[in-house]
Amino acid sequence: MWKLWKFVDFRMTAVGFHIFFALIAFAVHFACISSERFNWLEGAPAAEYYMDENPGIWKRTSYDG
């Protein structure tokens, strides 16, 4: 493996990998924003369907004490 780094610059390879993964992350996030189900900027219509009539009140589920 050490012979590989004689031909390839490690710093440029590391920078290239970071840029590549950042582009993949941006693509995934933009794909989520463009879909109706996973768009967190425009509100969540699926979450509004499941909301309780009093969403600000915490309910105890383990005990009634």
From Swiss-Prot:
Residues binding a bacteriochlorophyll, per UniProt: 29
Pfam families tied to this protein: LHC
Molecular function GO labels: bacteriochlorophyll binding; electron transporter, transferring electrons within the cyclic electron transport pathway of photosynthesis activity; metal ion binding
Gene3D superfamilies documented for this protein: Light-harvesting complex
Family matches, as InterPro entries: Antenna_a/b, Antenna_alpha, Antenna_alpha_CS, Light-harvesting_complex
Family statement: Belongs to the antenna complex alpha subunit family.
Primary role: Antenna complexes are light-harvesting systems, which transfer the excitation energy to the reaction centers.
Protein name: Light-harvesting protein B800/830/1020 alpha-2 chain
Species per Swiss-Prot/TrEMBL record: Halorhodospira halochloris (Ectothiorhodospira halochloris)
Lineage: Bacteria, Pseudomonadati, Pseudomonadota, Gammaproteobacteria, Chromatiales
